[in-house]
């Protein structure tokens, strides 16, 4: 029985390895692994831990993963949800000898809070912990967390890397191998949560246009954010590229070439008005995902349910490749119905 090469598709295949190589190149990584979803990639990190540990995680993050983190006590892990943009709060939550993993999402979904990766890396490594960064929103085009001190970077490759809303995938990349990385790779094989060869091929197809898509989406998002500030029906615009955004200075340092294609707005008339806006647009698609070529709008609290910490008047906007003026006029018309 051969012990090298491509033996069984559940472990890997050539298409998967080629796409992993491209991800590693984009991230400046030593190695990368592809999974069947972003959740599969993220949860594999925790399942590969060799002992119960204390975890510090971003308070604001993708709700699906936050829900899973609240369940991992059965594995012996303890999670402290911290506002990771507040470095004092991060330091205060750190338990020397107990904290083994930091998990930060930046910019964080859906408030787009920005965490200083380099500063948190210093805190994490000061207590011999591993820093993992969910950089799905920034993409490797705008931020390379490994170059800022992160040990592992995670992406929901369903989003920007694929970019066409026809693949579900996730990725991990590491600055250096080691025992944890080896266990993650074994965990993927044991659980059978690797991506299929065909989906890896589709993902590679999407990644060929990643740079041009992300830069266009970032440019359009910045234009929309600036125009929505002061819009009569909008009480707040959340976007790291705006000077008044709390994380703008950090974003200037760590996001190179743009601030991403995601923004959120809060509607003055409240929850029902926000839902009405989402239902009244024509060009924006009402759907839950982001990073694709079509612009999407969603009432995030409705998606997350009653336990959601997301404000009920918030609409999350994923900017696609449509014309910025067309997108603004469509949104402005829907907002005008609530005034």
PLM feature segments, named:
Residues 191, 280-291, 334-339:
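A common structural junction motif
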Residues 1-25, 30:
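A glycine-/small-polar-enriched, mobile loop at the entrance of the PLP active site in fold-type I
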Residues 31-233, 238:
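Conserved PLP-enzyme active-site core in the AAT-like
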Residues 14, 236, 291-293, 297-300:
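Positively charged, small/polar-rich N-terminal and surface patches that mediate targeting and assembly
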Residues 222-282, 301-309:
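Conserved small-domain helix->loop->beta segment predominantly found in fold-type I
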Residues 80, 91-95, 213, 279, ...:
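PLP-dependent enzyme catalytic core of the Aspartate aminotransferase-like
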Residues 203-212, 260-268, 315-320:
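Short, well-ordered beta-strand elements within core beta-sheets of diverse protein domains
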């Amino acid at each position: 029985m051969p012990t090298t090469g491509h033996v069984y598709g559940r472990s890997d295949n050539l298409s998967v390895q080629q796409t992993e190589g491209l991800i590693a190149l984009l991230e400046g990584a030593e190695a990368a692994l592809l999974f069947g979803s972003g959740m599969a990639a993220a949860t594999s990190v925790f399942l590969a831990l060799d002992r119960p540990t204390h975890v510090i995680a971003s308070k604001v993050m993708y709700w699906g993963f936050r829900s899973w983190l609240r369940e991992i006590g059965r594995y012996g892990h303890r999670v402290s949800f911290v506002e990771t943009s507040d470095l004092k709060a991060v330091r205060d939550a750190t338990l020397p000898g107990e904290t083994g993993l930091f998990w930060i999402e930046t910019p964080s979904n859906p408030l787009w809070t920005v965490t200083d990766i380099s500063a948190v890396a210093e805190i994490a490594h000061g207590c011999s912990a591993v820093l993992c960064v969910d950089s799905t929103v920034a993409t490797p085009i705008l931020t390379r967390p490994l170059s800022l001190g992160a040990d592992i970077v995670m992406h929901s490759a369903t989003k920007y890397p694929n970019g066409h809303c026809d693949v579900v995938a996730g990725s991990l990349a590491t600055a250096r191998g080691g025992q944890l990385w080896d266990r993650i790779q074994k965990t993927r094989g044991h659980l059978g949560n690797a991506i299929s060869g065909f989906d890896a091929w589709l993902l590679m197809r999407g990644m060929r246009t990643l740079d041009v898509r992300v830069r266009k989406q970032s440019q359009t998002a910045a234009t929309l954010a600036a125009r929505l500030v002061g819009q009569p029906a909008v009480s707040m615009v959340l976007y790291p590229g705006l000077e008044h955004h709390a994380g703008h200075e950090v974003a200037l340092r760590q996001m190179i070439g743009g601030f991403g294609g995601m923004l959120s707005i809060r509607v003055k008339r409240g929850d029902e008005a926000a839902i009405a806006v989402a239902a009244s647009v024509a060009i924006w698609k009402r759907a839950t995902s982001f990073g694709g070529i079509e612009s999407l709008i969603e009432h995030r609290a409705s998606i997350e349910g009653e336990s959601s910490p997301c404000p009920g008047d918030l609409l999350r906007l994923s900017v696609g490749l449509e014309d910025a003026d067309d997108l603004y006029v469509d949104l402005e018309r829907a907002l005008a119905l609530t005034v």
